């Protein structure tokens, strides 16, 4: 539900809740900070290129954690790098979200069994809101994950915890490939 879907009275007065206005503003101007560590970073960069154009979703990448509300961890997180991931996460203002992109950041990837130096998932050091699977995931998958973050923001309420919002999001899950194909068809028509 967008802000314009709310009720409008005869005198052009918008009637909605404060939650809806705040959530609409936050999801319409998502500022991610990419933390590219391996081959997933190449796919993340491709997603920011003109072929996929993330700005049409209101997503504009930032280079500073103090200006970001979303951290995209893309690639292999080693034990030494985990400290820096935590530091950057702590520098982000609230509300902050984390998207884990790729098998390596999700669960250690091909290094999970024999890589003593690899963190077995970035969720062991910072809370992760959305996981994007793949090795490396395609840009379409990352866009689907970003749309999941936007849905999570849309479902947040002042009295609702993030865990409850994540449960509601899981119940309303939609295949991201379907959404991308629908947008491509609409753009071509």
Swiss-Prot record:
Primary location group: membrane
An individual GO BP term: electron transport coupled proton transport
SUPFAM superfamilies: HydA/Nqo6-like (SSF56770)
EC code: 7.1.1.-
Subcellular location: Cell inner membrane
HAMAP family per the UniProt record, alphabetical: NDH1_NuoB
Record protein name field: NADH-quinone oxidoreductase subunit B
